[in-house]
Amino acid sequence: MVLDLDLFRVDKGGDPALIRETQEKRFKDPGLVDQLVKADSEWRRCRFRADNLNKLKNLCSKTIGEKMKKKEPVGDDESIPENVLNFDDVTADTLTNLKVSQIKKVRLLIDEAILKCDAERIKLEAERFESLREIGNLLHPSVPISNDEDADNKVERIWGDCTVRKKYSHVDLVVMVDGFEGEKGAVVAGSRGYFLKGVLVFLEQALIQYALRTLRNRGYTPIYTPFFMRKEVMQEVAQLSQFDEELYKVIGKGSEKSDDNSYDEKYLIATSEQPIAALHRDEWLRPEDLPIKYAGLSTCFRQEVGSHGRDTRGIFRVHQFEKIEQFVYSSPHDNKSWEMFEEMIATAEEFYQSLGIPYHIVNIVSGSLNHAASKKLDLEAWFPGSGAFRELVSCSNCTDYQARRLRIRYGQTKKMMDKVEFVHMLNATMCATTRTICAILENYQTEKGIIVPEKLKEFMPPGLQELIPFVKPAPIDQEPSKKQKKQHEGSKKKAAARDVTLENRLQNMEVTDA
């Protein structure tokens, strides 16, 4: 995932100042731009020198051939005149005045210079790439500039009643319908491990079927993706920080052959966006085939490093969940990708409106965007039991930022194009099932149970098409209130103090008696 290098090159029409400004607006290090420009300038000089050295080497070979054809003596003199040691000044006439043995010696020296130049070029290329991979995409003008997501995300619109309050949060409701095993899940899988069971399994499957059908009716091709990716491919779709904070690494044998002891390093996917982004890797996509729209279905795996203490109970924030994803390859021309961006968020809105989930759409501030996103809109549902908005959908236009590293090009082959162009790539959540279940539970709770949303009834089994009944008490009702806990703790402290006082008195009495 990278920007076009020509954007950093003034002689190619680029504007490093614009990228530096973008880095500042993202609250990232603008010095990376200067480091890249310096490394790129040196790299280009090095490549220019290597090209000239190769031309000179070819000229040496040509001159030797001509001299041999004329049957000139080879000679045994390998001394090199001073004027020849400066390769920049060597011409065909210079070489003509040398013996074949001398030209061969010059050619050997040129080979050494080329090797040295290539080593320097590779080093500079690595330095340039290290800076390039950490420089974010150019921002859309409508992105709010701030580093405070909580205070400055811009609310674009609201749908439904986002003021209503209800009694229970999803943490209690998943237990009340007997659809969740948290403690046992943690024993088996560790923190945030869980078993989804009973009615919530059917509700999850209903959401998956309804989301896939909705997207298929809008021209999306359903696609079930691999759950893990090779390291070299994941590096092309994920930014560096994700490897430490989000992705799980798995190691297995590199071959099915019993005598092969090599091991492969792979990564579990955090979203189906990652494998779908690589689906057309190294391809040319024809204009008449665009847009290509996929409805990705996958299990997603996330470490959630940095989320310690947040949403530790229930199924809202977990390490493993199912998700339906919108993913689109779009033309880079005529504002097509931005039109698609609006279409994708509208599709997500229609889905949640049809489920009767109130929400607002927020424009995410620049400092909270990942490197690839030029702009991101989130759909945050209203959770009446929790009294808060919670994110259900993220919709991003990454323009050509991802496609460039994956080499997914637009149009015909390079021979048919003046300049290579890259497709634009967009992604948007349709339905992360565990989070959507939480939203449904809170919004559709009654005294007796959870009303099944109208659109999901046909996907639910007989007996569960109208109401999911409560079969267990709410955990919060079983716990002592904070006031009761405080009073109980106070009573324990007073009792302990009385015991100490009584013991001291008894000891004093024993001393007096003695």
UniProtKB/Swiss-Prot annotation:
Residues noted as binding ATP in the record, renumbered to the chain: R302, Q303, E304, V318, H319, Q320, F321, E391, L392, V393, S394
Record keywords, A-Z: Acetylation, Aminoacyl-tRNA synthetase, ATP-binding, Cytoplasm, DNA-binding, Ligase, Nucleotide-binding, Nucleus, Phosphoprotein, Protein biosynthesis
Basic and acidic residues compositional bias, start-end: 479-502
Region (Interaction with tRNA): 9-61
Residue(s) at site: Important for serine binding: T429
Residues bearing the modification N-acetylmethionine: M1
E.C. number: 6.1.1.11
Positions of region (Disordered): 472-514
Its job: Catalyzes the attachment of serine to tRNA(Ser) in a two-step reaction: serine is first activated by ATP to form Ser-AMP and then transferred to the acceptor end of tRNA(Ser). Is probably also able to aminoacylate tRNA(Sec) with serine, to form the misacylated tRNA L-seryl-tRNA(Sec), which will be further converted into selenocysteinyl-tRNA(Sec). In the nucleus, binds to the VEGFA core promoter and prevents MYC binding and transcriptional activation by MYC. Recruits SIRT2 to the VEGFA promoter, promoting deacetylation of histone H4 at 'Lys-16' (H4K16).
Protein name as catalogued: Serine--tRNA ligase, cytoplasmic
Organism whose genome encodes this protein: Oryctolagus cuniculus
Annotated gene: SARS1
